[in-house]
């Protein structure tokens, strides 16, 4: 399971000209699910994201987490994060979780995130989404739970 997290000034997801999720300051998280990923590992990753200190504190250091920064969380499923790219000129998506199974796990992870944090927005699983964001920094990290 991989998460690409970006600190943003604002972000939104649009599907069929409708905004499905929108935040102001916060974290935009692209979430990739692998074949063997489980709910418990996903919960650990969500917990880490929520506690990860990537916002400037009163001293200008990355000392605040999402809650302390009073930010929002925008979760977007992105199976392409699981691609194998070491060989050849075309990504191999074999390591990604099959879509039906991934939707169940993604929905469970969204539900878990909502139970742990007040301001969670999402895209739509497997939809053709347009993601608009204003990066803050830019500050981008890839987190992985095996």
Swiss-Prot record:
UniProt cross-references to Pfam families, sorted A to Z: Tyr_Deacylase
Statement: the UniProt record of this protein carries the keyword tRNA-binding: yes
Major localization listed first in the record, in broad terms: cytoplasm
EC number: 3.1.1.96
Keywords: Cytoplasm, Hydrolase, RNA-binding, tRNA-binding
SUPFAM superfamilies: DTD-like
Catalytic activity, reaction form: glycyl-tRNA(Ala) + H2O = tRNA(Ala) + glycine + H(+); a D-aminoacyl-tRNA + H2O = a tRNA + a D-alpha-amino acid + H(+)
Motif placement: Gly-cisPro motif, important for rejection of L-amino acids: 137-138
Top enzyme category: hydrolase
UniProt-recorded Gene Ontology molecular function terms: D-tyrosyl-tRNA(Tyr) deacylase activity; Gly-tRNA(Ala) deacylase activity; Ser(Gly)-tRNA(Ala) hydrolase activity; tRNA binding
Location(s) in or outside the cell: Cytoplasm
Gene Ontology biological process terms, A to Z: D-amino acid catabolic process
Gene Ontology, cellular component aspect: cytoplasm
The protein's assembly and partners: Homodimer.
Family: Belongs to the DTD family.
Domain notes: A Gly-cisPro motif from one monomer fits into the active site of the other monomer to allow specific chiral rejection of L-amino acids.
PANTHER family in alphabetical order: D-AMINOACYL-TRNA DEACYLASE 1, D-TYROSYL-TRNA TYR DEACYLASE
Function: An aminoacyl-tRNA editing enzyme that deacylates mischarged D-aminoacyl-tRNAs. Also deacylates mischarged glycyl-tRNA(Ala), protecting cells against glycine mischarging by AlaRS. Acts via tRNA-based rather than protein-based catalysis; rejects L-amino acids rather than detecting D-amino acids in the active site. By recycling D-aminoacyl-tRNA to D-amino acids and free tRNA molecules, this enzyme counteracts the toxicity associated with the formation of D-aminoacyl-tRNA entities in vivo and helps enforce protein L-homochirality.
Protein name (database record): D-aminoacyl-tRNA deacylase
Gene source species: Acinetobacter baylyi (strain ATCC 33305 / BD413 / ADP1)
Gene encoding the protein: dtd
């Amino acid at each position: 399971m991989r998460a690409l997290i970006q600190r943003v000034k604002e972000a939104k997801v649009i599907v069929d000209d409708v905004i499905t999720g929108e935040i102001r300051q916060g974290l935009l998280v692209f979430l990739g699910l692998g074949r063997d990923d489980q709910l418990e590992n996903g919960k650990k990753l969500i917990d880490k994201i929520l506690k990860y200190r990537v916002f400037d504190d009163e001293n200008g250091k990355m000392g605040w987490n999402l809650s302390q920064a009073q930010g929002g969380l925008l979760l977007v499923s992105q199976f392409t994060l699981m691609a194998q790219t070491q060989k050849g000129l075309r990504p191999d998506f074999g390591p990604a979780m099959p879509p039906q199974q991934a939707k169940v796990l993604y929905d469970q992870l969204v539900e878990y995130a909502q139970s742990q944090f007040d301001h969670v927005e999402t895209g739509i699983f497997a939809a053709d989404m347009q993601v608009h964001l204003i990066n803050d920094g830019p500050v981008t990290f890839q987190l992985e739970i095996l």
